[in-house]
Amino acid sequence: MAATRLWHRTGRLLEIASAFGPWPGVYSTSPAFAEVLRMPQKQLRKVVYPLRELEQHLVTDSRPGLIEQRLFDPSLEDIGRAESVFAATVRNRIEYLSSAVRLDHAPSLRQPEVCFIGRSNVGKSSLIKALFSMAPDVEVRISKKPGHTKKMNFFKVGKHFTLVDMPGYGYRAPEDFVDMVETYLKERNNLKRTFLLVDSVVGITKLDNIAIEMCEEFALPYVMILTKIDKSSKGYLLKQVLQIQEFVNTQTQGCFPQLFPISAVTYSGVHLLKCFIADITGSLK
C-alpha cells in the first residue's frame, strides 16, 4: 500500500509533465525521468536543478559564492543514466538486506556504501522512499511519529552500492544511538559519503551541530541535504539556503560545499541527488 501511494504521488507529477513536448537531444533509460524531461525548461529546472531555480531570485549585489551550484552540475543525459542505477530490474536487484543495532551485526559487503543521518522527523525515510520510487518492492517504512527508525537499515542497490538508513537523533532516539553511529562512522571502511539531512524550514539546530561536529572530528566527507523545501516560500527558502551555505563555507572542513535542496513530495532535487550518489559510488562507469 505504501508503494502504491508513492507511485500515485509520482504519477501526479508525471501527469503534469506529459502535457508538454519532449526535451530535444536527451535520452533516458528511465521512463519516469523521460516524462520529467517533457516539462518546459523553467519547470524542469525547478525539479532537476533546484539551486539554479533559486539563483534566479538572487539580487545582483548578493555576495558571490554563497550558492556553489557548479561544483556538481551534471548534464541531463548523465542524470538520465543515473536513473537506471535506481531502477529495479532482473539484473539490477534493489532490496532490503538487514537491520543491525551494532556494527558487528551489520552485513559485510565490499561494495561502496553511503549512509543517511538526521534528526528525528527530518524526512529521512521519506527521502529514501523517493530515491527508491522505481523499486516498488522495497519497503521503506514511514511513520508520523518521530524516532521511528531504531536500527541501521541496509539496502542493496544492485552491484553498485549499499544505502544505510541510520536512526534519527534527538527525540525518541535509541539509547545506544551515539555508540552505534560513532562506531559505524569511524570503522566502516567502505563508507564513501555521509549524507546529513537538515530541515530547510527549521535550519541547523543544536542537534544538527552535534552531528556536524562528529563528522568533522572523524574527518569524514559528508554532504548536507536540505529537506522539505516544498513547505516554504521561495523567499524564505532562499534566505535559509544562503544562511546554511555561509555556515558550510565558513564553519566546516569536510562538508561538500554544494547543498542539495530536496522535496520528497514534488521530487525536486531527487534526480540530481541520485546522480550524485551514482557518481561518488562509481556507478556511472
Swiss-Prot record:
Record gene name: Gtpbp8
Top-rank taxon: Eukaryota
Keyword GTP-binding in annotation: yes
Residues involved in GTP binding: 118-125, 147-151, 165-168, 227-230, 262-264
List of residues binding Mg(2+): S125, T149
GO CC annotation: mitochondrion
Family indicated by similarity: Belongs to the TRAFAC class TrmE-Era-EngA-EngB-Septin-like GTPase superfamily. EngB GTPase family.
Cofactor dependency: Mg(2+)
Molecular function via GO: GTP binding; metal ion binding
Alphabetized PROSITE patterns for the sequence: G_ENGB
Keyword field: GTP-binding, Magnesium, Metal-binding, Nucleotide-binding
Domain EngB-type G, chain residue ranges per copy: 110-283
Pfam families on file: MMR_HSR1
Protein name, per record: GTP-binding protein 8
InterPro entries recorded: EngB_GTPase (IPR052279), G_ENGB_dom (IPR030393), GTP-bd (IPR006073), GTP-bd_ribosome_bio_YsxC (IPR019987), P-loop_NTPase (IPR027417)
UniProt keyword Metal-binding, yes or no: yes
